């Protein structure tokens, strides 16, 4: 075996994209052991902590090859049966002349033993371990087409109240209206904190976003279900085979409307926001809205989401909150106005 080739992989896209890149790095080494030394230059460095496949490399090392990582496979996602996880892998194969194959249907994230064995952030707040689901009831302003109406998220929470604790998360500078009856951690978690929350969570409820990718990438806790429950309110923007994971309940409407009759529409916003972003352009705007939100999301009613959660609860014999846990949690739940901004 010759001297390993040194690679620094570059990408500064969103954390969800970078979770896909972690899979590509893993499978580069799984398929070509000892052939490469790899390092990365990306945003969201917390995603790479404890990663066993990285070796610190200097960018000015003349032996290092810098590779800007992309996923052009997305351009044919409506025509090809490929998942987002294949995107960076396909690009590395084309760029490096390799035949990397996906070895696991998920990203590759690594918590420390201390992060896994310690009490969850929720347990630290409540004073005892409580089963909980993460809920993401909003999203980024550049992709408002992914938003589901906040009253529908609230209806799901209300249905499960007293049985399931929902922990609401979301970044401070994104749109995440406050929900009532949840443990409110919006704007209060680092990316690493979020990874720990997902690890300890019983399930995840979200739109198409980072959190569904974390749900698939994070290992599951010993003694729990073999896969982490995740319900995704997806609509019609992306073809389901590009985003969905086999063990998730991915509620989509592709094929139900003229605008997504043959695949995802791939549009960005439901209405223009006037912020100067190119996504205000007509070619990026939803063509079928209901009260300024996309019809493809409007078609998904709370009862459909509730049904998926209930199926997980029964199928995996997931435990509900006990009376004692409910009493301990109650004073910590959010009772502010539902449209309150993130502090």
Could you tell me what each predicted segment is?
Residues 1-343:
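Catalytic machinery of carbohydrate-active enzymes
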